[in-house]
Amino acid sequence: MAGHSKFKNIMHRKGRADAARSKLFSKLSREITVAAKTGLPDPAMNPRLRLAVNNAKAESLPKDVIERAIKKSQMGDAADYSEIRYEGVAAGGVGIIVEVLTDNKNRAAANVRSYFTKMGGNMGATGSVTFNFDRVGQISYPAKAASEDDMMEAAIEAGADDVTSDMDEEGEGHTVYTAFESLNDVAAALEAKFGAASNTKIAWRPKMQVPVTGDAVATLMKLLDMLDEDDDVQAVYSNEDISDEDLAKLG
């Protein structure tokens, strides 16, 4: 569920695939439960739940797990989750936004703060980082879904604001950005043309990126790892700019 930029920036962090997959499934299930609890338990009538279910399907979350997560929202003993946003700055000046979904606010705050402190960063006040980001709708497709020109044309026709395409073999494919109010309409138009997206969400897009080089790269990536791996953390957004050469040194 991490949101920090460029697929290549996280390729070196794929070693713990099974554990990461288990955590991802847990986070997807939690989002489904919360979405169903805050609205109707019917994806057709609940836009947030529809997005959560579609994203879960794109990640191959089993159908029975999705159904259980929805049913859980209707149980009287279902946990009460709080949605919290933390903001902080890593060593080197990289801004980080951490979105949390937790049943224990004190635990979540203490953990996130400890990660920043341990890696030489600092937690900030609300708004201390988000002013460097735009709140947008984000729709992702693999490169094979369409050519760069076809995706651009379809996205513009659907009302999107911007499209980036990374068509390399290990690239991140197509990312379509919209006003967050238009996300569902644009996503529906693209799905009609290209099929289901690999991910659709409200995201934080950096207005500018901060160059990170040398030893600071490993420190930053360790911090992002720690945040990603926390069970309470649903998404992480950051505005680093790291060269392919520095990423390659991480192994």
Swiss-Prot record:
The keyword Transcription applies. One of its GO terms (cellular component) is cytosol. It comes from the Bacteria. Disulfide bonds: none annotated. Its main location: cytoplasm. The keyword Transport does not apply. This is Probable transcriptional regulatory protein CCNA_03352.
